[in-house]
């Protein structure tokens, strides 16, 4: 499928979101990813293709890619993505992946590290949009206190009392004690990790 860059947004920390309009409505499930192709000059060893989670929920109507950028250390692909002009197109294949919620009545523990929050954003917004229950304990670790999507997550947590969120900033760890403390009242949760 062909994707046209419609907008970009600087997120918390060193993350940027890119918003693409697909040439045809892709049928994806929240949590899935696409395989993106971005030809560019002098590609490094990693080449011109990357996999990124679709950070947007299907109802949002556009494909959102959110990724981190590190000064002068990023791949040539990421630099080409960062410099892509509005209106430019790239190719994508997919969607793929089974990192999806098949039973919204089940209780989940989502563990996110850094930019690994992207599939959880899509999943939580999708559940809310469809009016489905959100029985989730989210543990979100990051190297600093600039958590991507924090305001969106907090807004959801205010609306859904069954969404519990705990943040951990390096050097703090999401360890067994943290997990047990957060899920002490949950019966047989399903654990998902990303990042």
Task: Give residue ranges: language-model regions.
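FNR/FR-type flavoprotein reductase catalytic core
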Residues: 61, 66, 73-195
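Ferredoxin-reductase
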Residues: 1-88, 142-144, 154, 170-171
């Amino acid at each position: 499928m062909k994707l046209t860059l419609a907008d970009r947004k600087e997120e918390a920390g060193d993350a940027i979101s890119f918003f693409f309009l697909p040439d045809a409505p892709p049928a994806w499930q929240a949590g899935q990813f696409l395989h993106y192709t971005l030809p560019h000059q002098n590609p490094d060893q990693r080449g011109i293709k990357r996999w990124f989670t679709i950070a947007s929920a299907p109802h949002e109507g556009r494909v959102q890619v959110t990724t981190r950028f590190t000064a002068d250390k990023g791949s040539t692909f990421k630099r080409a993505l960062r410099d892509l002009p509005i209106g430019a197109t790239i190719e994508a294949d997919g969607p793929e992946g089974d990192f999806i919620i098949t039973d919204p009545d089940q209780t989940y523990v989502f563990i996110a590290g850094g930019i690994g929050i992207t599939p959880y954003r899509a999943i939580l917004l999708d559940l809310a949009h469809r009016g489905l229950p959100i029985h989730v304990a989210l543990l979100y670790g990051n190297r600093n206190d600039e958590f991507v999507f924090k305001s969106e997550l907090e807004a959801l947590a205010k609306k859904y009392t069954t969404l519990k969120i705990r943040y951990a900033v390096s050097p703090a760890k999401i360890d067994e004690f943290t997990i047990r403390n957060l899920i002490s009242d949950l019966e047989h949760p399903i654990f998902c990790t990303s990042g």
